[in-house]
Amino acid sequence: MEVLELKPVKNKQVIAYMFAKENSMALQSTDPDLLTKFLENKGINFVTVDFDIDMKEFSRTTFAKVLDKIGINYYQVDIPEYAMGYLYEEIIEKEELLTGLTEEYISLEDRDSYKGQSLKNWIDLINIEIHEKENILSLRIRPMWIVKKMLDIAKNCQEVDVSFVHFVQTDICEDICSQVVELLREYNVKVIQYNKKHTIKNIIF
């Protein structure tokens, strides 16, 4: 099993280009020529993706076919299932406790009683704990795993100057892109983000 340990890439200059795409369907409408031109001009060594899509399905997109044609490897970056399962166990336990407490609270004849108020306070507290644990998992732990995988791939590249592109689903980006960028920069990766303010015909594929 992998250990969540982030280390900077030694003796290499690493550049990350980040793009947000609306969804996986946008990858199917990719302009092959524009994508190829961008990847070749920037000397891209590999591509990482963070989309809600099965990689077998992804491999059939126009986007993936372009990468295959020009010999650029692509990787899905995410928290491993075993790590997700381990961390999510605590959340499931809290949710089961919440269900039991809620059922007990609903069954009370006098919800304004001391017992009713105590149950209500407990339910509110459990709800807060669940929300906090979900935020820690999705907004802190997951970005760390994503960056770890990016750094590991960069370390395995033979080149001294390593460039990669990270494509991420827009709604996912809204949640975690700032954390991913911050972590990459913390580990000496130069990050260049592209958004709708840039010239569309030059950078949107």
Please tell me what each predicted stretch does.
Residues 1-205:
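Compositional signal for N-terminal targeting/processing segments
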